[in-house]
Amino acid sequence: MLAYILRRLLLMIPTILGIMAVSFAIVQFVPGGPVERAISQLQGADQSSTAQFGGGGGQIGSGGAQAGGDITSRYRGSQGLDPKFIKELEKQYGFDKPALERFWILVRDYSTFNFGKSYYRDVPVLELIKEKLPVSISLGMWMTLLSYAISIPLGVRKAVKDGSRFDTVTSALVIFGYAIPSFLFAVLLVVLFCGGSFWQIFPLRGLTSDNFADLSWPQKILDYLWHIALPVAALVLGSFATSTLLTKNSFLDEIKKAYVQTARMKGLTERRVLYGHVFRNAMLIVIAGFPGAFIGAFFTGSLLIEQVFSLDGLGYLSYDSLIQRDYPVVLANLYIFALIGLVVNLISDLTYTWIDPRIDFETREV
């Protein structure tokens, strides 16, 4: 098992490099980089009207020099500005070097989690991520744990009661939850419980109260749960349907197999059959969906929830940075997302062996 883990960890290196290379290459062709933005602000032009004719950050090609022409012609709106000032802008934002050299500098710095400074916030990117990460982790972990805590028992019950009235009624509820996205549940919960039109029970903004630092530990826990209750409820209502149906179908497939009939013929109780024999086999496919559920909630699923409940998390930071073309923050977020995703997938694979010891990764190719 140790050899398998080491192989997987080593394979993460080219995967991360590939993700970084693709992300870096895409950024090179996105118009309206930081140099153009600085120029447009100096010229009093609207930021959205800026464009570039070549590489990222307002750079044509990969080098810092333009063949046969004045340097200011690289950037729309740069006419009238001192070429030396344009060079200083390029140096400030790191675009005075060839693209390939910038990429290897990026790889070197990211290997030590040195993400540089945000272009527009003037703070280290790592500090921004540390500040926003707890919010996204809280939403992702609570949503995933509660969603699976509801969907697994419900899916097992639906499989046992397949075709009954209970199965029919819960199927309607599951389909309803699947059809409506989480952010609509969030808006509904705000209207109902945050003083929109009915009750003022839960807070509308933030993850903690203003006087959080002055509270005792029990009060801090209650305050945190009070703030996070509705965002997590909205995420769970919009996400438990898939894992519920997956659990039900997986159990139905296993229940029909011969070993289940043999266990029943031996006189084992139904509970012993379900949780002593069927559960381990049926849960493999459910566990396989755990990384996707967590990553989805962690990165994309919580973006609109963060907007509705005014939670300053990593999802909103990524969106805002992409809109502002704050490339250090965008690339750092992609790097963190990819790294966490790969680690969670590895943990998911290792969980297979805990659920079913018959699985041996040592004898299989990665």
Can you annotate each of these PLM segments?
Residues 6-12, 16:
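N-terminal signal-anchor/signal peptide hydrophobic helix marking the start
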